[in-house]
């Protein structure tokens, strides 16, 4: 019997991690905000949409990559809280799946890799 690549354990775990890390971040991202930290990239992403440049027109606290990525999400989905949380959820998905793949490349057991990546997605 052929081993179906689509339905092997590793791919199923990656699909589950995708949905789990996306949905948990969407749920808790809409629970509330912490005003000191929550709007740091919101404002800079919006300013990039207005045509301003980081470091030239305003000071950036964490580097321009996240701000430009946030501007892309604002451009595609509109300037609102949902697109802001979707951006955070997208990064959570990328980091969680990357964690799983790196742990698997270190030859860690697939179940341990999945559990650690799931826990990482809750924290990230």
Identify the residue ranges that each predicted region occupies.
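Start-transfer (signal-anchor) and selected internal transmembrane alpha helices
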Residues: 1-24
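Membrane-interface starts of transmembrane alpha-helices
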Residues: 9, 79-87, 109-113
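Extracytoplasmic catalytic/substrate-binding loops of multi-pass membrane glycan-assembly enzymes
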Residues: 29-44, 57-69, 79-82
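Luminal/periplasmic active-site loops of membrane-embedded glycosylation enzymes
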Residues: 44-54
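Aromatic- and kink-enriched transmembrane "portal" helix at the membrane-lumen/periplasm boundary
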Residues: 81, 95, 117-124
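Transmembrane-helix motifs of polytopic, lipid-linked glycan transferases
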Residues: 86-108, 115
């Amino acid at each position: 019997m052929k081993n179906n690549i689509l339905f092997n354990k590793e791919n199923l775990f990656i699909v589950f991690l995708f949905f789990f890390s996306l949905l948990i971040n969407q749920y808790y991202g809409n629970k509330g905000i912490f005003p000191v930290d929550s709007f740091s990239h919101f404002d800079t992403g919006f300013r990039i949409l207005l045509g301003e440049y980081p470091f030239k027109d305003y000071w950036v606290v964490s580097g321009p990559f996240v701000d430009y990525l946030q501007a892309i999400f604002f451009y595609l989905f509109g300037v609102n809280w949902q697109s802001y949380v979707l951006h955070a959820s997208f990064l959570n998905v990328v980091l969680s799946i990357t964690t799983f793949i790196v742990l698997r490349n270190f030859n860690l057991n697939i179940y341990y890799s999945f559990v650690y990546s799931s826990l990482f997605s809750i924290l990230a």
